[in-house]
């Protein structure tokens, strides 16, 4: 594969083959890692016997994977952050995801064909990869028979995302994002390193050696864009070396990076982690450039970032099924508003009540309304640097 600058590189993808496998279709599942530690890569954490401690957020992602595998689809799970564990670097994630698809299609033991249809899906950090897979597929993966791209809670603009995260409960994502972006850009890393304060150096070192939950508990309410972490950090996002990089991490900004297969985007109106309007703007810009985009706004006031992922598992599954079946898809930009994605006739028709019960149990027991249980857990167990 290659880095975001097209330099030669290597990575891994993990392939899951169900017993009832349909050998003519492939799902490219971009799970969120949202961290920079080497042990956070899915190719390691998913393996039996890995030393990685149980991570409840991975369990959330397994709900969709379980449904996809039960439907008989082969699944490929690329380590799209690459060898430098670069969280937040969209173009790199897109290229490595596309090369993961190519490698999987070329893996003869699977009996897939080069033109086997592929559907890509990702949420949150995985939506960074899904969005950039969609954006770069026409140019970098034109040989791939892409049928569609699903993405939810999409960090479509890294500048806006960093500003929303900074100094908030989920500011650890900003720590991991700044670290990942710096390690993917040698010039930025050389510029940033001598400007880090002692606290900033500790934060970068921690982010490079720990995964999502540990970082969340270590760095809530941290001001990364400040003198606290970086000398001159108050103006970090105004520095030319930073703005020149981040301007290339905006979905929909360039007409040459427009998806040609259908795009399904979903986002909670009250998402407390990822900016809603940045994702909406990306979908609108893609459509202005010729893409077909269905943007779903989840309006129920108690849906937070985590709950929005879970309640849309059935809709993502339907999108995958419909793309493989070549069903019709709205042309241009279509905006739908949904109160409760679980309350739909199609969920009832396809007898998904067991899945709905699983989702509701997780939301009630582990997440809570408006992600309250998660937020309280972070506050209660925070270990400040």
Curated annotation (Swiss-Prot):
Q: Which GO terms describe its molecular function?
A: triacylglycerol lipase activity
- Tell me, using the record's free text, what induces this protein: Constitutively expressed regardless of pH conditions or exposure time.
Hey, which family's this protein in? Belongs to the AB hydrolase superfamily. Lipase family. Class Lip subfamily.
Q: Which organism is it from?
A: Malassezia furfur (Pityriasis versicolor infection agent)
Q: Name one GO biological process term.
A: lipid catabolic process
- The gene name reads LIP6
Mention any one GO cellular component term assigned to this protein in its UniProt record.
Answer: extracellular region
The record places the active site at: 124, 271, 305
What Enzyme Commission number(s) appear in the record?
3.1.1.-, 3.1.1.3
Q: Which SUPFAM superfamilies match?
A: alpha/beta-Hydrolases (SSF53474)
Q: What does this protein do?
A: Secreted lipase that hydrolyzes acylglycerol lipids such as triacylglycerols and consequently releases free fatty acid. Can hydrolyze 4-nitrophenyl palmitate to release 4-nitrophenol and palmitoic acid. Due to an absence of fatty acid synthase genes in Malassezia species, secretory lipases are essential for the yeast to generate free fatty acids from degradation of sebum and assimilate them as lipid sources for growth. Plays important roles not only in lipid metabolism but also in the immune response of host cells and pathogenesis.
Its localization reads: Secreted
Q: Which PANTHER family match?
A: LIPASE 5, PTHR34853
State the reactions this protein catalyses: a triacylglycerol + H2O = a diacylglycerol + a fatty acid + H(+); a monoacylglycerol + H2O = glycerol + a fatty acid + H(+); a diacylglycerol + H2O = a monoacylglycerol + a fatty acid + H(+)
Task: List cystine links.
Answer: 40-211
Report what the protein is called.
Secreted triacylglycerol lipase LIP6
């Amino acid at each position: 594969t290659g880095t975001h600058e097209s330099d030669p590189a290597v990575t891994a993808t993990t392939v899951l083959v169900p017993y009832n496998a349909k050998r003519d279709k492939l799902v490219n599942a971009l799970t969120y890692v949202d961290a920079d530690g080497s042990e956070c890569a899915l190719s390691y954490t998913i393996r039996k016997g890995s030393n990685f401690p149980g991570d409840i957020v991975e369990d959330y992602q397994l709900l969709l994977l379980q449904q996809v595998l039960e439907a008989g689809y082969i699944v490929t799970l690329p380590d799209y952050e690459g060898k430098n564990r670069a969280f937040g670097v969209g173009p790199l994630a897109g290229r490595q995801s596309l090369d993961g698809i190519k490698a999987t299609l070329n893996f003869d033991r699977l009996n897939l064909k080069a033109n086997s249809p592929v559907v890509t899906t990702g949420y949150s950090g995985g939506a960074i990869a899904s969005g950039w897979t969609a954006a770069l597929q026409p140019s970098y993966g034109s040989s791939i028979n892409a049928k569609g791209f699903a993405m939810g809670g999409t960090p479509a603009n890294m500048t806006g995302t960093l500003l929303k995260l900074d100094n908030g409960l989920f500011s650890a994502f900003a720590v991991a994002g700044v670290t990942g972006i710096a390690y993917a850009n040698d010039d930025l890393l050389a510029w940033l390193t001598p400007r880090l304060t002692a606290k900033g150096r500790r934060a970068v070192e921690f982010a490079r050696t720990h995964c999502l939950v540990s970082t969340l508990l270590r760095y809530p309410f941290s001001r990364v864009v400040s003198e606290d972490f970086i000398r001159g950090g108050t103006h970090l996002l105004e520095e030319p070396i930073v703005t020149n990089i981040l301007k290339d991490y905006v979905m929909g900004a360039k007409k040459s990076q427009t998806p040609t297969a259908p795009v399904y985007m979903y986002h909670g109106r009250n998402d407390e982690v990822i900016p809603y309007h940045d994702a909406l703007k990306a979908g609108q810009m893609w459509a202005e450039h010729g893409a077909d985009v269905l943007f779903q706004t989840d309006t129920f006031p108690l849906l937070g970032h985590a709950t929005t992922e879970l309640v849309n598992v059935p809709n993502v599954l339907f999108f995958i099924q419909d793309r493989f079946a070549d069903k019709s898809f709205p042309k241009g930009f279509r905006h739908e508003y949904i109160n409760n994605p679980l309350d739909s006739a199609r969920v009832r028709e396809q007898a998904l009540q067991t899945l709905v019960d699983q989702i509701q149990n997780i939301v009630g027991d582990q997440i809570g309304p408006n992600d309250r249980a998660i937020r309280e857990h972070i506050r209660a167990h925070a270990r400040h640097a």
